[in-house]
Amino acid sequence: MNITLGYIDPVAFSLGPIQVRWYGIIIACGILLGYFIAQAALKQVGLHKDTLIDIIFYSAIVGFIVARIYFVTFQWPYYMNHLSEIPKIWHGGIAIHGGLIGGLISGIIVCKIKNLHPFQIGDIVAPSIILAQGIGRWGNFMNHEAHGGPVSRAFLEHLHLPDFIIRNMYIEGQYYHPTFLYESIWDVIGFVILITLRKRLKLGETFFGYLIWYSVGRFFVEAMRTDSLMLTSHIRVAQLVSVVLIMISVIFVIYRRVKYQPIKYENSGPLTWPIKKAK
């Protein structure tokens, strides 16, 4: 690993011609940690310990593919002239919202096939997802991407950041806002809140709470970033999607409480699709 002033090599190590990047290692660690945390939640509601294996496997694969497609779509003017770069996901360039869409769709399909209740599974994995996202942002840090606008070294020192973060925010002769860190901290706080409140919330509300919490933080952090995917010259895609997710989640939670009076998560027990108790 090559570490010099202001630079941490994105490549952790090489195996012959194969470069193993910190980006992939960190994302894999986030997924694994999230899986083990979700395993404990499975036991609490009486579901089998292997329930999430297929869901996480397919959601991770489809999520990564859709996340890349999402990113490439909004950067098509570049990729249309660099087609060989499209599959090089290890260089970075995936969009969390794309991954969320792909993971959500595949997760619902697997729940249907496995006869699982999607809201219950969503509540189980929501804290793990936001924690994995918070950890994954450190992959952006290692790749020297997803940072904010220029700042001074004095500004970063005023934040009392560790020296290795300050050094690695020195990119091509300029210090930048560590927006990866802002979002990572926000996500970890969200993880603690969701884990703490999950038992008190109605079925499905932990997942929608995740969407709301993540989207609020992403909206404000995105305004600081210099590499946003743009819908128009003034509209950032991530901010627009965040607003839509907040609105949908709030409306859905209110509607379900008024219309259906859903049961509490802690009282749900093992549920099947759509809401029948498993025998």
Swiss-Prot record:
It holds the Pfam family LGT. The keyword Cell membrane applies. Its EC number is 2.5.1.145. A 1,2-diacyl-sn-glycero-3-phospho-(1'-sn-glycerol) binds at residue 137. GO terms for molecular function: phosphatidylglycerol-prolipoprotein diacylglyceryl transferase activity. Disulfide bonds: none annotated. InterPro entries: Lgt. The keyword rRNA-binding does not apply. It is found in: Cell membrane. It is a multi-pass membrane protein. NCBIfam families: lgt. Catalyzes the transfer of the diacylglyceryl group from phosphatidylglycerol to the sulfhydryl group of the N-terminal cysteine of a prolipoprotein, the first step in the formation of mature lipoproteins. This is Phosphatidylglycerol--prolipoprotein diacylglyceryl transferase. It comes from Staphylococcus epidermidis (strain ATCC 35984 / DSM 28319 / BCRC 17069 / CCUG 31568 / BM 3577 / RP62A).
